[in-house]
Amino acid sequence: MMKSIRFLASALALCLVDAYLVTPPGTPAPGAASACSAWVQASYGLTCDIIHRFYGMTAAEFEEWVSKCPAAQLYPLNYICTDSAKNPSVSQLGDGCTLISGLYYCVQVNYITQSPTWTPPTTTTRSTSSSAGNGVTTPTPTQTGMVSSCNRFYLVVSGDSCYDIAAAQGISLDNFYTWNPAVGSSCGGLWPDYYVCVGVISDGTTTTTTTTTTPTTTSTTTTTAGNGVTTPTPIQTGMVTNCNKFYQVVSGDGCYDIAAAAGIALNDFYTWNPAVGNTCAGLWPDYYVCVGIIGSSGTTTTKTTTTTTSGNGVATPTPTQSGMVSNCKKFYLVVSGDGCYDIAAAAGIALSDFYAWNPAVGDTCAGLWPNYYVCVGI
């Protein structure tokens, strides 16, 4: 009986040493860094290269986080470092990098500065004086390049968008991007659980917040083109001056959905509203967009079936996006909410093949259009 108790205690002790900054939802890959704060589960079609590009890390970083013993200054008391902890399937990256399906791999590490006495991580956020010496304490973590004159901060949570944060804080979106350059001009670099700047010190003395947002009430003005049509505001820059039909964007809208509901072609929507970009990344809620112009009767999309031009005898359904391979034999109709990885996995093909056969979707899946057919087999 005593031997069983000692064995159980030893087993529990071994489990305790595998502590992580953020506990993975399932079984972690052997040798994952104890300072790991984000995880991804290996599944069919997921490759090391996809992980590198999606999470913005180098192959060397990924190898270190998932297969090497953590540095001594990280968590010296909660991890036993041995060579046997390395995971051969990842440590030998190169062209032969493979992942073990079902295991969780580390994709983010939060480092802690070495100190004489180690203190376990807590749920509270560390604060340090800003490097500018302006007397304002800056909470951490923050992304690189944040303005040194910041005096108001916001902790990003999953699901936030740059527009929503700026609107809630009463600042302009342009100022938000200027103060937080790491998030990028399309908000693609906004990281949950990081602090962003939402207010700055004016003239180095007074604490103020610049407010240039549009009031929630909507006013109307006459278009500068003098076409007699009143244009509601706010609108984004560059909208065509001969617009005679408008739509106010709501949170959750997509460019394709707006165009389809208005009975116009997506290309026309992008042309009439250039500020939204050709991937819809610049679509702003609560702003009006153009969905009809003078002299246009709209475009009705009809679905027909035609034979492929390559003469392979396979009927190709329409519509399809440009550039799809001509020797495709198997098709899938995209529905709203689909992702390239999910489509490829369901069809049993590699994600790289899906991108190669459907170049219009791009290598980040930003160009995937609902209600269009894509190739999932050749």
Curated annotation (Swiss-Prot):
Pfam families: LysM. One of its GO terms (molecular function) is chitin binding. Residues 1-19 form the signal peptide. Residues 152-198, 245-291, 330-376 form the LysM domain. Residues 118-131 have a biased composition (Low complexity). GO terms for cellular component: extracellular region. Disruption phenotype: Has no significant effects on cell wall chitin content, cell wall integrity, fungal morphology and fungal growth. Does not affect survival in a mouse model of invasive pulmonary aspergillosis. Keywords: Cell wall, Chitin-binding, Extracellular matrix, Secreted, Signal, Virulence. It is found in: Secreted; Secreted, Cell wall; Secreted, Extracellular space, Extracellular matrix. It comes from the Eukaryota. Its main location: secreted. Residues 118-139, 208-230 are annotated as: Disordered. PANTHER family: AM15, LYSM DOMAIN-CONTAINING PROTEIN-RELATED. Cell wall chitin of A.fumigatus recruits lung eosinophils during infection and ldpA might have a role in sequestration of chitin and act as triggers of host immunity to dampen host defense. The LysM (lysin motif) domains are small globular domains involved in binding chitin in eukaryotes. LcpA contains 3 LysM domains. This is Secreted LysM effector ldpA. It comes from Aspergillus fumigatus (strain ATCC MYA-4609 / CBS 101355 / FGSC A1100 / Af293). The lineage of its organism: Eukaryota, Fungi, Dikarya, Ascomycota, Pezizomycotina. The gene is ldpA.
